[in-house]
Swiss-Prot record:
Record-linked NCBIfam families: nfo, PRK01060.1-1
Protein name as catalogued: Probable endonuclease 4
Metal-binding recorded as keyword: yes
Cofactor, how bound (note): Binds 3 Zn(2+) ions.
Keywords, sorted A to Z: DNA damage, DNA repair, Endonuclease, Hydrolase, Metal-binding, Nuclease, Zinc
Length: 298
């Protein structure tokens, strides 16, 4: 079974149940959530996440595994502000606890961090320090380090940087990787013409067994732009053919594929989610040039 879904919202009183219902309405077989707003530290207590009802709904609809994304505000790469580093460590610990409580997520996707001017090596050492403070040998979920585009002072812009972080961490069996197609393309890897070669390079440097999550996004920018701006499937510089190949890649059948493509529409207050139609299009193997108009008409 193709494990494909998108980012969905966990909100209101229904929380996990709402997320599962939204995913099912898109024809998804997996999904990704934030356990609270990605840009702040406000979190509902675990008891209010409506876990039991959400899990029951998932079970009824054949969804076995979901992904959690850590909030953007975590930056364990910060070497200049101890309070930012400490917030990242404390918050990541809390996210591990919350993700474990869900019982259906094995991976927490984490943007490794930004060195904020101290240089990549210093940032990587700080990320290693943070992960060593957080990870324990008995935790049940992995931290999936996301491949980054190289925007600003982001660490994790190359497979070598990801490998360096993993190698420095004591309990690194608790680390995996989230391969983001837009980020990897924007960082300079040729996933359009040579995805198999890129995957082979990843295997040599990091190890393909670590690749546990895929973020499937097209890109608004040319390869190597270092920008990180997602585009709808088939409407960017990566293109439908390459993304379809990645989604159906025989070496990655077990890996959940998560869409984070932009909502569609001119009116900011009335943008439509693209996921139902994008998932259908990735399943059926044919690019639909009229897709964006169909999304708007939903």
């Amino acid at each position: 079974m193709l494990k494909i879904g998108s980012h969905v919202s966990m909100s209101g009183k229904k929380m996990l149940l709402a997320a599962s219902e939204e995913a099912v309405s898109y024809g998804a077989t997996t999904f990704m959530i934030y356990t609270g707003a990605p840009q702040n530290t406000r979190r509902k207590p675990i008891e209010e996440l409506n876990i039991e009802a959400g899990r029951k709904h998932m079970e009824q609809n054949g969804i076995e595994e979901i992904i959690v994304h850590a909030p953007y505000i975590i930056n364990v790469g910060n070497t200049t502000k101890p309070e930012t580093f400490q917030l990242g460590v404390d918050f990541l610990r809390m996210e591990i606890e919350r993700t474990s409580a869900l019982g259906v997520a094995k991976q927490i996707v984490l943007h490794p961090g930004a060195h904020v001017g101290a240089g990549a090596d210093a940032g990587i050492q700080q990320i290693i320090k943070g992960l060593n403070e957080v990870l324990t040998p008995d935790q049940t979920v992995n931290i999936a380090l996301e491949t980054m585009a190289g925007k600003g002072t982001e660490c994790g812009r190359s497979f070598e940087e990801i490998a360096k972080i993993i190698d420095g961490v004591k309990y690194n069996e608790k680390l995996s990787v989230c391969f983001d197609t837009c980020h990897t393309h924007d960082a300079g890897y040729d996933i359009v013409n040579n995805f198999d070669g890129v995957l082979n390079e990843f295997d040599k440097i990091v190890g393909i067994d670590r690749l546990q999550v895929l973020h499937i996004n097209d890109s608004k920018n040319v390869r190597g732009a270092g920008k990180d701006r997602h585009e709808n499937i088939g409407f960017g510089h990566i293109g439908y053919k390459a993304l379809h190949h990645i989604v159906h890649h025989p070496q990655l059948t077990h890996v959940p594929k998560i869409l984070e493509t932009p909502y569609v529409g001119e009116d900011k207050k009335d943008k439509k989610p693209p996921y139902k139609l994008e998932i259908e299009m990735l399943k059926n193997g044919t690019f639909d040039e009229g897709l964006l108009e169909k999304i708007k008409a939903q």
